């Protein structure tokens, strides 16, 4: 009997010591530990105590929380919305190779907002994505699995092009809406987390955002280091317009190439604006990089298409972006069973193919009641990071 009482007392002492040691951890150390965890774990720990909740919801923590960039993508099947996040980092940047990835793929499915236009999706900007439902922009936080409709624009702004920007100095996202179809001298800007009111911002550069034939330009704006870049038509011809997210000022950047260059995509190459396309005359691929914004200095890199390394690849893979390490990302236009991504470094001339398990294979289809048919219309978001920002 006495031995049992002694054991009980020992257990209670250990528990009390454990509680005192955990509660006595410095707040900065606790915050540092949380910052190294996956976002879904941090969200789960918010329910443990008021202290942990206050630490992980504080603006300084949510603004500084940043994970390693991943390749995120989704597809729709009926009213279901399947979201995947896969690693994109390269462990051997100086070598060409193929391998099957054993890393765990994070995935979930939810219900997609009805009557939303998936062709108006922006890129992933510091963890958030914006698209629209008619004239109503909607913000999506894939990490928190939340959608938030913004205040609807007035009737004069039915046809809009939506861009999403991020100011790294103040840590704020801004949604920029521009009319398309007609040239304009003004746009509408809304700062997330503020009073959610649209403000009018004017420019001295009358322009019309460039659109492809038959619709809105698909993700043709890019936010790089606090500046949104987009193609536009002006009275003097086609140019690139820049919008500084913090100062809310526009500027014009002249195109450096001639009529033989066909622009395919704008993207961020190691923190600088890059324009990828092809040369009609030489039948080659080129990448123009804006090396110096103030001096408008560009460099041009010419490289061979991926079909040079493996014939026929360009028939089945589409360019979707570039990693922070400078690798071009080619993704499949259709998935049946195996899901693989090609990463190509045009400067180093290294080529790697990665097969990811658990994406649209038989097990996945059985668990989610999907038919054994090809999956098309996948939407990809390179360099996506997790964010704990509340909408």
Curated annotation (Swiss-Prot):
Pfam families: F-box (PF00646), FBA_3 (PF08268). It comes from the Eukaryota. InterPro entries: F-box-assoc_dom_typ3, F-box-assoc_interact_dom, F-box-like_dom_sf, F-box_dom. GO terms for cellular component: cytoplasm; nucleus. Residues 1-12 have a biased composition (Basic and acidic residues). Residues 1-25 are annotated as: Disordered. Residues 19-68 form the F-box domain. SMART domains: FBOX (SM00256). This is Putative F-box protein At1g47730.
């Amino acid at each position: 009997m006495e031995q049992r009482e002694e054991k009980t007392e020992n257990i209670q002492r250990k528990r009390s010591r454990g509680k005192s040691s955990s509660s006595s951890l410095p707040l900065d150390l606790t915050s540092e530990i949380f910052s190294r965890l996956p976002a879904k774990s941090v969200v789960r720990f918010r329910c443990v105590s008021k202290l942990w909740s206050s630490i992980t919801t504080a603006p300084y923590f949510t603004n500084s929380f940043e994970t390693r960039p991943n390749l995120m993508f989704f597809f729709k099947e009926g009213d279901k919305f399947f979201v995947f996040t896969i690693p994109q980092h390269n462990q051997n940047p100086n070598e060409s190779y193929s391998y099957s990835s054993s890393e765990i793929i994070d995935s979930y499915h939810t219900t997609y907002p009805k009557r939303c236009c998936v062709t108006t999706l922006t890129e992933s900007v510091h963890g958030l994505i914006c698209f629209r439902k008619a004239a109503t922009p909607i913000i999506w936080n894939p990490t928190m699995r939340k959608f938030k409709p913004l205040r609807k624009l007035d009737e004069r702004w039915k046809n809009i092009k939506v861009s999403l920007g991020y100011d790294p100095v103040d840590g704020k996202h801004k949604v920029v809406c521009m009319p398309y179809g007609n040239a304009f001298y003004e746009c509408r800007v809304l700062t997330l987390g503020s009073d959610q009111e649209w403000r009018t911002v004017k420019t001295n550069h009358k322009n019309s955002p460039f659109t492809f034939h038959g619709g809105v330009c698909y993700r043709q704006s890019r936010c790089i280091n606090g500046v949104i870049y987009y193609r536009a038509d002006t009275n003097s011809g086609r140019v690139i317009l820049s919008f500084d997210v913090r100062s809310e000022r526009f500027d014009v950047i002249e195109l450096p190439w001639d009529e033989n260059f066909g622009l395919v995509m704008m993207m961020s190459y190691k923190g600088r604006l890059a324009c990828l396309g092809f040369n009609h005359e030489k039948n080659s691929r080129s990448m123009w990089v804006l090396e110096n914004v103030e001096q408008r200095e560009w460099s041009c890199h010419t490289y061979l298409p991926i079909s040079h390394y493996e014939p026929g690849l360009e028939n089945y893979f589409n360019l979707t972006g570039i990693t922070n390490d400078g690798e071009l990302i080619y993704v499949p236009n259709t998935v049946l069973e195996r899901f693989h991504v090609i990463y190509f470094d045009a400067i180093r001339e290294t080529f790697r193919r990665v097969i990811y398990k658990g994406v649209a294979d038989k097990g996945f289809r059985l668990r989610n009641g999907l038919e054994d048919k090809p999956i098309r219309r996948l939407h990809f978001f390179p360099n996506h990071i997790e964010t704990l920002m509340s909408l």
